[in-house]
């Protein structure tokens, strides 16, 4: 198999840990007193009803204030803008060994982040984890107006990277994204930890 020329890294769950459960706990902490229990017991139904606003936000089709408006309308509450922003963003941990490994590989392989994310989260991560700024480029869903595993996302990413699909390798922790990339001709590995990744990369980089 030919050696990979360009590495494409998923962000959350690969280069940096994050937690959706922490997001909901954060939201509980900023709810008005009488709304907290209602929010807790209805969180699964709320997730479903807020799917469209959240999806639009990740695609860059809705602003942060428009997302907050949608949450307020659904919950019938008024939320402080900065408290909402802090609750929304404070879901990330620190980059670990995989990020350090990615940096070492970047010395010989151009490397890009491909992430389903929004402007708020990406800016927060860049400030919180400047050790990730070694990447040659960042391709977030909100800028290309498409989400992994949609073909449009990968097609746009390849245009930005400027390399043939078969010369690129995606590393992603979501199997559907791996399969979507492969359908577009991109080589892809399902991330299941650093040790397994090193084993699977042997001979490719």
Walk through the language-model features, giving the residues of each:
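N-terminal helical cap/lid subdomain that shapes the substrate entry/recognition surface
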Residues: 2-99, 107, 118-121
């Amino acid at each position: 198999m030919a050696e990979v020329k360009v590495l494409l890294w998923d962000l959350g769950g690969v280069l940096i840990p994050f937690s959706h459960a922490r997001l909901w706990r954060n939201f509980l902490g900023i709810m008005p007193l009488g709304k907290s229990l209602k929010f807790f017991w209805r969180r699964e139904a709320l997730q479903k009803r807020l799917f469209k606003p959240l999806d639009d936000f990740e695609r860059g089709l809705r602003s942060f204030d428009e997302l907050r408006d949608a949450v307020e309308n659904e919950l019938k509450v008024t939320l402080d803008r900065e408290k909402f922003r802090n609750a929304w963003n404070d879901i990330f941990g620190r980059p670990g060994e995989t990020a350090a490994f990615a940096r070492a590989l970047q010395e010989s392989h151009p490397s890009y982040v491909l992430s389903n994310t929004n402007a708020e989260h990406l800016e927060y991560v860049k400030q919180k984890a400047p050790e990730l700024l070694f990447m040659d480029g960042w391709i977030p869903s909100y800028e290309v107006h498409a989400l992994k595993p949609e073909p449009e996302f990968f097609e746009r990413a390849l245009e930005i990277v400027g390399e043939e699909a078969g010369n690129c390798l995606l590393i992603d922790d979501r199997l559907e994204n791996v399969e979507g990339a492969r359908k577009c001709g991109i080589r892809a590995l399902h991330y299941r930890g650093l040790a397994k990744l090193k084993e699977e990369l042997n001979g490719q980089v």
